[in-house]
């Protein structure tokens, strides 16, 4: 069991590099638009209601709806598809990268980023409870909080569980920003076409996923109730 948890943790770290790449690519190449999150978009929606010009409002709402559809799709996949959803998530992300490359000619950044608005929440949901921790692979706020609070608790109390928790969230942050660095360097040379470099962390994650699953594509069991309870307690948005 311990070995499997370690494998799941490494899978989580690798997938976090995809999340970092997606977030950085969107921000750098599409007017600071973060396709991995809806916080800024929802703020812009409300703010736009009080502006005299509403030309972008429909695109903002569309982005929010597509993001919501990504969450709905995750639930449907999780409940009705026998294939392992972690693998499906990576497949959908690869399709999203291809669609983004096609839509790059569109001047409207909201339209160009719609595939990432859809794929990001599916990845988030699929990898949120890895190794028993409620950690997101697509943005960093909660991961920073968990790293700092866990490390502080460990330094005060010497609790080894807090040390392991800080290590997990810290490694997630490290790999996330490896993805950010990849997107940043790629943009220098290929601008918007740098989306194709996203297949590098995707390929690494796919190999890690197969290693974790021991090359079994079909899922034959569920997480233990104990692990589910841990995830339920720690997942926060």
Regions found by a protein language model. Name each.
Residues 2-237:
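Alpha-helical transmembrane segments of multi-pass membrane proteins
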């Amino acid at each position: 069991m311990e070995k499997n948890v370690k494998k799941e943790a490494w899978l989580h770290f690798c997938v976090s590099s995809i999340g970092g790449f997606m977030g950085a690519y969107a921000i750098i190449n599409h007017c600071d638009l973060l396709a991995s999150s809806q916080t800024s978009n929802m703020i812009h929606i409300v703010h736009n209601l009080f502006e005299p010009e509403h030309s972008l409002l429909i695109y903002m709402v569309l982005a929010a709806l597509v993001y919501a559809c990504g969450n709905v799709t995750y639930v449907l996949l999780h409940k009705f598809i026998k294939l392992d959803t972690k693998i499906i998530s990576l497949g959908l992300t690869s399709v999203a990268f291809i669609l983004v490359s096609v839509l790059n000619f569109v001047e409207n950044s909201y339209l160009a980023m719609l595939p990432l608005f859809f794929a990001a929440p599916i990845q988030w949901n699929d990898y949120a409870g890895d190794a028993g921790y409620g950690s997101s692979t697509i943005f960093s706020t909660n991961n920073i909080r968990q790293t700092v609070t866990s490390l502080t608790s460990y330094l005060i109390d010497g609790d080894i569980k807090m040390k392991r928790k800080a290590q997990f969230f810290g490694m997630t942050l490290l790999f996330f920003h490896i993805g950010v660095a990849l997107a940043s360097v790629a943009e220098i040379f290929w601008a918007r076409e740098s989306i194709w470099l996203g297949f590098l962390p995707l390929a690494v994650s796919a190999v890690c996923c197969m290693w974790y699953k021991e090359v079994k594509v079909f899922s034959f069991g569920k997480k233990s109730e104990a692990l589910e309870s841990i995830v339920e307690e720690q997942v926060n948005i």
